[in-house]
Amino acid sequence: MKKINTFFVSFIIVILFIGCSQDSNKDLGYLEVENIEDIRKLNNLNYVDIEEIKSLADSIFTTTNIMFSKKGIKNQVREISPIRTKENKSSIYIVNYENGGFFIMPADKRIFPILAYSNDNNFDLNTKEIPPFLIEWLQNQNSYIADLQQGKIKDSVDFSKHWNANFIENYIAGVKQSKLTARGTYGNSPELIYRNGPLTITEWGQGEGYNNMAPNLNCLSQSNGRALTGCVATAMAQIMKFHNHPNSYNWSIMPNKKNGNSNTNSGGFNEISKLMRDAGNSVNMNYGCENSGAITSHVANALKSSFSYKSAIYTEHDILSKIENEIKNGYPVILRGGEEFIFNGQSIYTGGHAWVCDGYQEVMIEICIKVGRWGYDCHDKIVPSYYMNFGWDGLWNGWYLSPFKGDYGTFDYKNGIIYNIRK
């Protein structure tokens, strides 16, 4: 049994400081992950067991005509990792594929079948790397689904008809229905209303190849001994690469990502390292081997004063509407999120992270709410999702349901956004 736990967070009693740790150091308590599950199917029509997930997973990402046509290959499920509740019931399944791609699916048909997905990247469950705020996101969903399974939440929405491979493939592929389709008659077919993104093409990280000009602290975790760049600097750098501004950098030689054959000391990676060093210095980065942190609210002024951007604004209000407006206008944003710990009556902000959001989509589905004993009231519902680039070499990048509000799973403490970034 593999656990995501055993580590303890060093508390940071500050309000706005973002420390982006390579080691999550988060005690998850009962949040457990396994690769094999052998439990009896519960006497509950809403419960989704691992065999049903496996059947769906084997059908969805494994054809050449849906998600992997651009690769021209068929894909295979690498592993299915259930996350369990305190009662030892599966609440969430994380499905990873051999050639890239993942799903995060709930174990209950009263919830929309796809909580997050990517057709390229994997959702790595390595406890030494997974960011604390993503663990918090999983915990929040785990708690919500556990309450739903125990009857603590009287949720009467029925998503069961959406739990099939055809619906999920159409949802991911972004199928647009005929304009003549009457409202409310979509049935099992989702309709893509809007999609834009991901806008950036970089999948940069914080380690070797990006930290070539960070302070040399003799870090054992890095072969070059240098500190991590920090998630704030990595997010800033990816945004500036999107704009190719300012012109004091050679943008054309910067590689979009690192792979096993990359020369991390090449001119291109050194140019990225220069950019990330300058970004870190502009926000007074506090460098470390496992954690390099800075204050995200300083990013907007740094972009204007140090990198000659005409505008950039930081706020903690109306974040979702600002994400949607910016991406619809063709601009990515930087987000901040973390988790709250109450200690001795004080609110402590810990496990923070800054990352890029550069995609937004809306899909129309039909949902049915139970009315009385036998009846259902069916109507249309918009399901929004957001593309997240977390700044860890592509790990965990993908489309997520609403990150800041909703019934299940949020990065919902000390939220912030840097938007209106214009050169």
Regions found by a protein language model. Name each.
Residues 39-86:
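Short, non-transmembrane alpha-helical segments in secretory-pathway proteins
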Residues 398-423:
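Low-complexity, Gly/Ser/Thr/Pro-rich intrinsically disordered linker/tail segments
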Residues 70-109:
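Exposed beta-strand-loop-beta-strand "reactive/processing" segments of non-cytosolic proteins
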Residues 83-99, 313-386:
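Active-site-adjacent substructure of cysteine-protease-like catalytic cores
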Residues 1-9:
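Bacterial N-terminal signal peptides that target proteins for export
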Residues 1, 13-42:
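Bacterial Sec-dependent N-terminal signal peptides
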Residues 106-151, 394-404:
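A short, surface-exposed interaction/processing loop segment used at functional sites
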Residues 23, 122, 129-292:
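Active-site-adjacent structural segments surrounding the nucleophilic cysteine of cysteine proteases
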